[in-house]
Amino acid sequence: MALYDRANSRNAYAEDSVLHESELVSFVKTTYKFFAGSLLLATVGALLGLMNFQAVVQYKWVFFIAEIVAFFGLMFSKSKPGLNLFMLFAFTSLSGVTLVPLLGMVIAKAGLGAVWQALGMTTIVFGLMSVYALKTKNDLANMGKMLFIALIVVVVCSLINLFLGSPMFQVVIAGASAILFSLYIAYDTQNIVKGMYDSPIDAAVSLYLDFLNVFISILQIIGIFSDRDK
């Protein structure tokens, strides 16, 4: 009888494992669908913004505040299906619009090709760090505290440079930010495949912010060095 009970327990455990794995695969697929949708809407937002460049530049603070409001709306609607997806796409669309002044600066200094170059580099970084997260034997969860401290340092340095206005200091900040968010890509990717997020929305916004910040950092570096070449 005891042997029979143990056999049943093993079968139940195997069934639970298969069910959990199936749910995790579905979770990951949904996450990357939302991530892809976020990138698409951010691109649409940026294109519409570039088509109305003067208006976006004139009201850039309005769009920035709207983006912040949408982000906090997303954070507060995490547990509300439907609304959280709407807020995710509202936030990502607005983040594309608020990129327009930076995109315009880079295009003016280095041409449209520089934007595609930055996007290509960001995509390569994202792909490489994602593969690393999936292949490595290391538990990247241990990086969490270090990455958060580094993020605070980068934010503080960015605020300081708002007053200093140093191009070279900005290059250092952008370089550090690119490295930091590249590491965050690996960190967040591993957390996603381990099922550490509560919902695909949470996971998708983490990946989106990682991608966006690497892209912004590369754009800033290209813009600054293009200006120095002239």
Swiss-Prot record:
GO terms for cellular component: plasma membrane. The chain crosses the membrane at residues 34-54, 56-76, 87-107, 111-131, 146-166, 167-187, 205-225. It is found in: Cell membrane. The keyword Methyltransferase does not apply. The keyword Cell membrane applies. Keywords: Cell membrane, Membrane, Transmembrane, Transmembrane helix. Pfam families: Bax1-I. Disulfide bonds: none annotated. Belongs to the BI1 family. This is Uncharacterized protein jhp_0854. It comes from Helicobacter pylori (strain J99 / ATCC 700824).
